Structures are given as C-alpha cells and as structure tokens.
Amino acid sequence: MKKLFLTILFVMLFSLNAFADSMTHDIDIQNRIDSIGFNILNSNKINKPVVFRYRFENSTKFKKSGAKGHKITIYDDDYMHAENDDEIAAFLAMKISAAVKSYDKSAIPVVNSLQSRIMPKKYEVFYDKQAVDFVVNAGYNPLGLITFITKTCPQKNSDFISRHNLTSKRLAIIYERIFTQYPYFLTNNVYIHNDYYQNFLLNSINNRKLLEDKLKYNYHYEIHYE
C-alpha cells in the first residue's frame, strides 16, 4: 500500500512538473510573439489595436493560423516552422495587414466584406506586399517571408477555382517587391545559403526571368506570374 501511494505521488509530481514546464514554454513563446508583433505595429505607426495569441493544439484536427477581427492567432503547426524572428515577423506582418484592413469595414461593412470575399486573391497580394514593407520598417529581413511561405504553403496545380493565389505567384510578387523596393537585402543576402531560399530559387527560375525581362526592357506592364 505504501509503495502504491509513493508511485501515485511520483506520477502526480512528474505530471505537475511537466505541466509547469509546458506552461513556461508557452509563456516564452507568447512573449516572443508579442514582442515581435508590437514592434511591427509601433515601427509602422499602426494606430489600430491588434492582439496576438499563441495556441498549442494537441488535436488531430488541423487548426489554421490567421487573423480574425483584430486578433491574430498562431498555432504551433505554423510556429514550429519559424526558425528565427524574421520568419515570425513575416507571418505576423501578413496577418497584421489583414487585421488592420478589417478596421475599414466599420465604415461600410457590407461593401468591404463583399469586396474581400469577391476578390480574395487581390487582397492576398495587397497583404503580401504590405507585409514586406512592415517587416523592413520594423528592422527584419523580408526574405524571411519567402522562406516561411516556402515551408508552410504547399503549391497547388492551379488557382483557377481557388480563393488563394498559387504559392509560386505569391513568392514571385514578394520577390519583385523586395527586388525593386529593398534591393539591399538581395545585394547583401544573408539567406543565400539557406536551404529553403535555395529551394525558392530553384522553383522560381521562370518567374524571375519574367521580372528580369521587364526591368531589362523597361516594360511597365504587370507581370502575370505562373
């Protein structure tokens, strides 16, 4: 009986320690996300309140991170792919752009809601481009957008009936934004040996050639990336 009691006590203490360690781990992650998120808000002088939440879901049901209203939630499935602050900032900046845009709906809610539903791809491009500006203004490397999306957004065969652009198109548009507005990060490319950036280069040869031709011949048309 005494041995059984000691065994139960040991299991309870072990469980409590494990729970405490888990809580500490989650708090550390939440603090990191808050620090990066509010740095982006303050550095870009965004005067629209936005809050950030980290969630660990021990469930077989996939939880999608994103912005709902003025709250941005990042689940562990996405957070686990972020290797550094650049990539966390990349995710948060895209969602901050969507969260800030949601404030516009307060004026004419029906019109704004319909626009975002009817033209989701257009808004996605806007969010991606603005995210580049947000992370640069906050002191992060925008190439983190490319590496993070490369790891977390699978490429589909077509986006004809999808509400989202092909990942290859998104990456090409982000790359063009960096190339034309923030070339310093490509000239001094600290991601050049990064496996995920190298994978992007490997899969974006045709799209980067389209950009090269546009700049070479001083064309002013909008590139239709593949």
Predicted features, each with a name:
Residues 74, 86-87, 95:
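Membrane-embedded segments
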Residues 90-106:
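Active-site recognition of the HExxH zinc-binding catalytic motif
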Residues 20-23, 70-76, 109-115:
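Acidic/histidine-rich, surface-exposed loop or edge segments in extracytoplasmic proteins
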Residues 21-35, 42-64, 71, 79-81, ...:
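C-terminal capping/extension segments of zinc metalloprotease domains
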Residues 69-70, 87, 105-106:
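Short, glycine/charged-enriched secondary-structure capping and boundary segments
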Residues 102-124:
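Post-HEXXH active-site segment of zinc metalloproteases
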Residues 4-16:
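Sec-dependent N-terminal signal peptides
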